[in-house]
Amino acid sequence: MKAAALHDYGQPMTVEEIELDDPKDTEVMVKVAASGVCHSDYVFVAGKPFFEGPRPIVLGHEGAGVVHKVGSKVTNVEVGDHVVLSWIYSCGTCTYCVVGRPNMCDFGRGEVIANGYLADGTTRLHKGDVPYYHFLGISTMAEYTVCDQKSVVKVPKDVPLDKAALVGCAVMTGVGAVINAAKPSPGESVAVFGAGGVGISVIQGAVLAGAYPIIAVDNKAEKLEGAMHFGATHTVDVSKVDAVEAIKAITGIGADYTFEAIGNVKVMRNAWDATAKGGTEVVIGGAGMGDEVSLPALDFPFTEKTIKGTGYGGARMSVDIPRLLNLYKAGKLNLDDMVTTTYALDEVNTAFDDLKAGKNLRGVLMM
């Protein structure tokens, strides 16, 4: 099969023929239909990975497709089912899984991510005797992928797979940051730093929650225009004005909730300064390894502000992925306009170049 492999950090991807073994007992082979082009893939191509892992590795962690084969002990899907792939494997037995926080699974966020293996500690990808490794347990930038059954969620067949793929990362991360992590009340104010795929999803989550005003913050006019299309009520162009002053001018006191959807420690500080007393900053973006953010210590007792992180939108994947797709089908979540460009798998490096240039809200590889 064809797959997009990364042989070393900071190098272009190569689309090549590699071998994929059949699924084991609890595993599923998926014919991938679509894979979103996400910043979390790009950082590895750019040489600034979130973690050090084995190589060569087949990237891609935001995907959807059709079940092609199943192992003998698979119980949740059948051949022909449409599925969204989840980049967090949930073991079901660790403390976090047991208390209903599968997105924080110790095993899924530990060994599966770091080692490039599936849950049993081996890889299904290889070229002859040379092993290739799995990215976040799903490797969706390929014609086919094998993953554990716990990494797939069955979805309705009437949802286009290129739209369903977005719920595998960007949309779940952004909408979930609002409805699962922040939980604003109707009428509370929201400011979103970064109007890319995740930021736009935060805006859509804020609309669902009834927040007002909803302020989009970015340095690209075209992204701010797009943010208005998805529900932002105000925009702040940081290439022209100071974000903190502009947000306080709109709200009077700062935003009740600020969301950092970029992964930049300076922006994290700006979001903190733009948060109202008693408000909350929610950090979504992944900064570089070793990066630290500095905050004034006296702000904690004097302003009662809170800063918190959220991973994968606090998702309970088997529950929240279908829930978001039901909202899409009901016309309450706009996925159609989020896909701005589609690419063939052979165009993967062009897709990453366009991501770096900020040309897309979401680019999607179509297999």
Can you say where each PLM-predicted feature lies in the sequence?
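Short glycine-centered segments of the SAM/dcSAM-binding site in methyltransferase folds
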Residues: 82, 189, 279-281, 306
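Cysteine-cluster motifs in flexible loop/terminal segments that predominantly coordinate metals
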Residues: 87-150
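Mid-domain Rossmann-like dinucleotide-binding core that forms the NAD(H)/NADP(H) cofactor-binding site
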Residues: 143-144, 150-152, 156-241, 245
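Glycine-rich beta-strand-centered segment in the early N-terminal region that forms part
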Residues: 21-35, 48-98, 103, 111, ...
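ADP-ribose/adenylate-binding Rossmann-like module
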Residues: 275-290
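Rossmann-fold dehydrogenase core element
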Residues: 280, 295-337
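C-terminal hydrophobic helical "lid"/dimerization subdomain
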Residues: 241, 249, 269-273, 318-367
